[in-house]
Amino acid sequence: MKNILITGANGQLGNEMRLLAEVNKEYTYFFTDVAELDICDEQAVMNFVTDHQIDIIVNCA
C-alpha cells in the first residue's frame, strides 16, 4: 500500500482530496497544512517523508 502526503489539506483543493480519499481505500493518506508541516522547511518535509515512508506528495497549498 502506498503512502500519500497531501499538503494544504485545509484549502479548497485539499478538502476535495479528502473526499476522494474517503472512497479510495487503496492508499494511506496523510493530510497536513502549514500548522502541522511547513513545506518551506525542507528538513521538516524530509523528516516527515522519511518517518511516514511517503511514496507520493500532492501539493495543494
Residue ranges and their predicted role:
Residues 3, 28, 53-55:
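Structural signature of beta-strand start/N-cap positions in the alpha/beta core
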Residues 2-24:
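N-terminal Rossmann NAD(P)H-binding glycine-rich loop of SDR-like oxidoreductase domains
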Residues 28-39:
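A short beta-strand-loop structural module common to alpha/beta enzyme folds
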Residues 2, 34, 46:
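Generic anion/oxyanion-binding catalytic loop in active/binding sites
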Residues 61:
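Conserved NAD(P)H cofactor-binding loop of Rossmann-fold oxidoreductase domains
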Residues 37-58:
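Conserved Rossmann-fold cofactor-binding substructure of NAD(P)-dependent oxidoreductases
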Residues 24-28, 43:
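Short, glycine- and charge-enriched coil/turn segments that flank and shape catalytic ligand pockets
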